[in-house]
Amino acid sequence: MGLSDGEWQLVLNIWGKVEADLVGHGQEVLIRLFKGHPETLEKFDKFKHLKSEDEMKRSEDLKKHGKTVLTALGGILKKKGHHDAELKPLAQSHATKHKIPIKYLEFISEAIIHVLQSKHPGDFGADTHAAMKKALELFRNDIAAKYRELGFQG
C-alpha cells in the first residue's frame, strides 16, 4: 500500500503549505477534531475545560499542541514510508501513556484532510487529496501494527 514517488511529491508539496503556518493549521486541525468528535477532548487534560470554539481559539496550549502534532507528522511524512524510527516512540507514548485509540487517529486524519481542503482548495485537488489520504492511512496502519507489538488493542 505504499505511495508512488509522484504521490509522495504531491503530499510533500501540500505539506510545504502546512509548514508555512504550523500553528494555524495545527490549531484548526485540533478544533475540527474536538468539535467533530468531542469524546477525543477527554484524552487531553489540558483541553478538557475548553467547551467553545472561541475558548479553543484563545488557548495557547492548544496552539502549541497543534504545532507539535503537525511537526511530528511532517517529520513522518518526509520519510516517505520509511518512518519506523519516528513511529516507534510515538506509538509507545500514544499506546502506553496516553492510550489513544486508532479510531482517534482516523478522526484526526479526517480533520487534517478537511483543513487542507478548506485552507488550500486550489492546491488540494483530487490527486493530492487521494495521495494525502493514502499517506495518512499508511501512517495509521503502521502505528496500529506498533500498538499490537506493544499489546495495546486501541
UniProtKB/Swiss-Prot annotation:
Cellular component GO terms, alphabetical: extracellular exosome; sarcoplasm
Reaction(s) catalysed by this chain's protein: Fe(III)-heme b-[protein] + nitric oxide + H2O = Fe(II)-heme b-[protein] + nitrite + 2 H(+); H2O2 + AH2 = A + 2 H2O
Broadest EC class assigned to this enzyme: oxidoreductase
CDD domains to which the protein is assigned, alphabetical: Mb (cd08926)
PTM-bearing positions, type Phosphoserine: 4
Binding positions for nitrite per the UniProt entry: 65
Residues annotated as binding heme b: 94
Domain Globin: 2-148
Family assignment from sequence similarity: Belongs to the globin family.
Protein name as it appears in the record: Myoglobin
